[in-house]
Design a protein with these regions (language model features):
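Flexible glycine-/small-residue-rich
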Residues: 134, 149, 293-295, 467-469, ...
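Conserved hydrophobic residues forming the short capping helix/wall of the S-adenosyl-L-methionine
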Residues: 104, 398, 534
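His/Asp/Glu-rich metal-coordinating catalytic cores
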Residues: 1-67, 72-283, 302-313, 335-338
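Short acidic-glycine loop/turn motifs at beta-strand connectors
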Residues: 23-26, 148-151, 243, 419-421, ...
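Structured loop/turn residues at beta-strand edges in well-structured enzyme cores
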Residues: 61, 128, 183-184, 286, ...
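C-terminal tails and terminal domains of large nucleic-acid-associated
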Residues: 519-552
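Hard-cation-handling environments
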Residues: 197-326, 330-355, 359-499, 503-516, ...
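C-terminal edge-of-domain segments
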Residues: 456-458, 468, 545-555
């Protein structure tokens, strides 16, 4: 009996944090290992959010391979966190491997088993046949992956658009292999849903050249562009425009410069000779130049804020500059993006954004998805990667094409689609899932004390109460000293501070008199009493931090 199980540890009903699991009998294949940025109410010092890897940790020995289809954070950003817990072979294309290896070195991850594979290839992992096919997306070397089962292939498309005019092989969509896979028999097709609400094809609306070229043509001074590092397609468009208008280019980001070196080393794309100026040779009084400011997530907006505030050592904006914001906000970065635009308008009135209604992100639109479904002709269709409305929109595309509703599988994170002997089982089981907050490289339990403490501090403040007692007699010899931050306006609430001190004294003195004094227990008792009193007087629940310092004194 053949048994295929399909489920997600992240990436369903959310933007980012993509991680999908295909179980072929006893073998586990993982596709993607991504993160997402925290929303404004999740921040609290959290840098990123990853899937909970508990299921994979418990089943580590069954994992035969982890496929990372391209170098975006939403599919690769959690890989270092994953490898701190699980040892597994990683399969990725050469450019993605270079990106990851730099990140792994920074985080001290070593001895990773990385298999560099071509975008269009077939090979075996154990007895399982794997086929890959190149896709057109915003970063080079992207691919989709097909895993052979006894009942047909399980295919994951990754991000893709259908574009027949791509000049560079590293961005080309492999229509031939997609057609070949369809003819071999596809059991289940997993496609992205982010662009499933857009009519038509994404191409040629994914290009910014037609929108940005008139700005280049009319610009008299410098041109400053912001762009995400991982949108290499857009970076190359800007470089080619600079070359067309005979302007030099300065790339102002170490990671983006490294990526362009990687592109040249791998033979994918080379910046035209003599066009690029290194940052150390850049002068702020240069006019005939395009400055490309790269970055990821919110870092790019903070970098531009620093430049606009004249705090940067290399670039200062001038009122003659033309600024093109080609890095639209992504979920979790909206506030930083808005602040950046305000800062830019204070320095120059020539600020242009990329119209997201005219320029599509490089995700499959409705007609792209229809073509993929038609060519693959899967038995089961599984929308993935997107918010719930996008998953439903994607499902409706297949429904409109005549697919039976019972053959369209819309899952939530953790829900398992189980296909036995080619037939979907009605009983729906689940695996444990959740969000893991990462701060400073360390994982924080989303429901744990660290985040609860941070939330308390951000809303209700903190009160610290300190006393010094004689180690031998337990007599109070110093304090109490009460410090309040973010709780009350001290001028109007002296009586509260005095009463908190009295509560602390009485708690210690009573415990000593009753011969039950214990430092830890006294602090816990004082914390509880002070919290009740402050709640009654102020309506707040601040963090209460009692401190009892015991010292030896000589008579």
């Amino acid at each position: 009996m053949s048994k295929v199980r399909i489920f997600a540890l992240g990436g369903l009903d959310e933007d980012g944090k993509n991680m999908f699991v295909i179980e072929n009998n006893d073998d586990i294949f993982v596709i993607e290992c991504g993160m997402r940025y925290p929303t404004s109410d999740e921040q609290l010092g959290v840098e990123m959010i990853t899937p909970d890897f508990q299921y994979l940790v418990e089943n580590e020995k069954r994992i035969k391979g982890v496929f990372v289809t391209h170098g975006h954070d939403d599919v690769m950003g959690a890989l270092t966190q994953f490898l701190k817990q699980v040892k597994a072979p990683i399969y990725m294309a050469p450019l993605t491997a270079r990106l990851f290896e730099r990140k792994a070195r920074k985080e001290g991850i070593r001895d990773v088993e990385i298999h560099r594979i071509r975008r269009n290839t077939n090979f075996k992992i154990g007895k399982t046949e794997i086929r890959t096919f190149g896709t057109t997306q915003s970063i080079a070397d992207g691919f989709g992956v097909a895993i052979r089962t006894e009942d047909g292939y399980v295919v994951y498309t990754s991000e893709f658009i259908v574009d027949y005019d791509v000049k560079m092989d590293a961005f080309r969509f492999d229509l031939t292999e997609v057609t070949e896979l369809g003819s071999r028999g596809v059991l289940a097709l997993l496609t992205e849903s982010v662009g499933s609400t857009r009519e038509g094809h994404s191409s040629p609306n994914h290009r910014i050249t037609s929108q940005v070229e008139p700005i280049f043509d009319n610009a008299e001074g410098r041109i400053v562009c912001t762009v995400y590092n991982q949108n290499l397609y857009r970076v190359i468009e800007l470089i080619e425009l600079a070359n067309k208008f005979k302007r030099k280019v300065m790339i102002y980001d170490d990671e983006l410069r490294s990526l362009m070196v990687d592109m040249a080393d791998l033979g994918y794309y080379r910046i035209p000779a003599g066009l690029e100026i290194a940052p150390q040779n850049f002068s702020n009084d240069m006019d005939n130049i395009v400055v490309i400011i790269g970055g990821t997530g919110s870092t790019i907006f903070r970098k531009v804020h620093k430049i606009a505030s004249r705090e940067d050592d290399v670039i200062q904006l001038r009122d003659t500059d033309t600024v093109i914001v080609a890095s639209p906000a992504v979920p979790g970065t909206e506030r930083d993006a808005s602040n950046m635009e305000d800062d830019l308008y204070k320095e120059t009135s020539r600020v242009y954004g990329v119209d997201t209604k005219r320029t599509f992100s490089m995700h499959a639109s409705i007609e792209d998805l229809k073509m993929m479904i038609y060519l693959m002709n899967p038995q089961y269709y599984v929308p993935v990667k997107g918010e719930y409305r996008q998953l439903i929109s994607n499902a409706n595309i297949a429904l409109d094409m005549g697919y039976p509703a019972n053959n369209i599988i819309v899952l939530e994170n953790g829900m398992i689609a189980c296909i036995e002997d080619g037939q979907l089982q009605r009983e729906m089981k689940t695996v444990p899932v959740g969000d893991v907050m990462v701060s400073g490289g360390d994982s924080l339990d989303a429901a744990g004390m660290v985040l609860k403490d941070r939330e308390t501090l951000s809303t209700d403040g903190a009160i610290v109460v300190g006393v010094v007692v004689n180690h031998g007699t337990k007599e109070i010899i110093g304090g109490p000293d009460v410090q309040s931050r973010g709780v009350i306006y001290l001028k109007d609430a002296d009586y509260i501070i005095r009463e908190i001190g009295v509560i602390m004294e009485n708690t210690i003195n009573t415990a000593v008199a009753e011969k039950r004094y214990d430092n830890l227990e006294c602090r816990a008792e004082a914390r509880e009493k002070i919290a009740r009193y402050v709640m009654k007087e102020t309506g707040k629940r601040p963090m209460i931090l009692p401190a009892i310092v015991e010292i030896n004194t000589k008579d």
